[in-house]
UniProtKB/Swiss-Prot annotation:
The protein's role, per its UniProt record: Exhibits S-adenosyl-L-methionine-dependent methyltransferase activity.
InterPro entries: Ppm1/Ppm2/Tcmp, SAM-dependent_MTases_sf, SAM_mthyl_Trfase_ML2640-like
Signal peptide positions on this chain: none
Assigned keywords, A-Z: Methyltransferase, S-adenosyl-L-methionine, Transferase
Organism in which the protein naturally occurs: Mycobacterium tuberculosis (strain ATCC 25618 / H37Rv)
Family: Belongs to the UPF0677 family.
Disulfides per UniProt: none
EC class of the enzyme, as a word: transferase
Protein name in the entry: Putative S-adenosyl-L-methionine-dependent methyltransferase Rv0731c
């Protein structure tokens, strides 16, 4: 059985085959599955080779199509299809966010906790756009080396910032050439649930401090990751872990996310000068003709996608 070292602790670190890093591999595998669907919403040609390079057998088989849903138990097959659907609409949402931001004239993009994100290689960026990728050093190094080995080249000026988001990443970002006097498009995709309430607020403070009016930001709100729903969601995550264990993978999401009450990112953003818009997973699935996801196939509950534009910077933001 593949051991992932799931338990979180202060100052923990990971690679793409363990702990929080393994979730990036899981999501990339789902992007590969989603890309094979009829009328696919996403086309991430780098997802499968990156997952293969990480080498976690279950996700390699999933990404390559060797893990045929028809050969799985009914709950596993449906769960795999629905997870791929969820990641398709998520990827499509953040892809479009960046494309819309560049159409609005923004030429500076930041991907926080970039993991196996390949947007700097697969999206069509306008000339002069700089894309900054921020993640732990071993994650950045692995992806850069792997894609170079595949002969892939970025489609824009890609700059890597090898730093933990719990450290002084704004300084590292500026050293890489980030200009906080220019409008920026930021994404924190699949990130906030893996931060404590305090770390989430600090990250949002830092993003706001590094933004000028006209900057844009997109993320997700895990509406149900709170004390009220903790028991139910932990149960869903444990049952998902049992599905994984049937295939030799030890990954328990309940040991990776931070439960408990936290500020809703929409409330934070509105209180700090951002104008927000949001759409639920259910809304986005329906928009693309896909059925809703619920029960054990929604281990995080209802996910809300949020985009925001900074209208007026408040004086108390540091």
């Amino acid at each position: 059985m593949t051991q992932t070292g799931s338990a979180r602790f202060e100052g923990d670190s990971w690679d793409l085959a363990s702990s929080v890093g393994l979730t990036a591999t899981m999501v990339a595998a789902a992007r590969a599955v989603a890309g094979r669907a009829p009328g696919a919403l996403v086309n991430d040609q780098f997802a499968e080779p990156l997952v293969r390079a990480v080498g976690v057998d279950f996700f390699v088989r999933m990404a390559s199509g060797e893990l045929d849903p028809d050969e799985l138990a009914e709950d596993e097959a449906n769960g795999l299809r629905r997870f791929a659907d969820a990641m398709a609409i998520r990827t499509h949402y953040f892809d479009n966010f960046f494309l819309d931001a560049t159409r609005a004239g923004i030429r500076q993009a930041v991907i926080l906790a970039s993991g196996l994100d390949s947007r700097a290689y697969r999206l069509r960026w306008p000339a002069g756009t700089i894309v900054f990728e921020v993640d732990q050093p071993q994650v950045i190094d692995f992806k850069t080396t792997t894609l170079a080995g595949l002969g892939a080249a970025p489609t824009t000026d890609r700059r890597t910032v090898a730093v933990d988001l719990r450290d002084d990443w704004p300084t590292a970002l500026q050293k890489a050439g980030f200009d906080n006097a220019q409008r920026t498009a930021w994404i924190a995709e699949g990130l906030l649930g893996y931060l404590s309430a305090e770390a989430q607020d600090r990250l949002l403070d830092q993003i706001t401090a590094q933004s000028v009016p006209g900057s844009q930001f997109a993320t997700e709100v895990l509406r149900d990751i709170n004390r009220l729903n903790e028991e139910e969601l932990r149960g869903r995550m444990r049952r998902l872990a049992e599905r994984f264990r049937r295939h030799g993978l030890d990954l328990d999401m309940s040991g990776l996310v931070y439960f408990g009450d936290r500020t809703d990112a929409r409330t934070y953003l509105a209180d700090h000068g951002w104008r927000t818009a949001s759409a639920s997973t259910t809304d986005l699935l329906a928009e693309h003709g896909l059925p809703p996801i619920d029960g054990d196939d929604a281990p995080f509950g209802e996910v809300i996608y949020v985009s925001a534009e900074l209208k007026q910077k408040h004086q108390d933001t540091r």
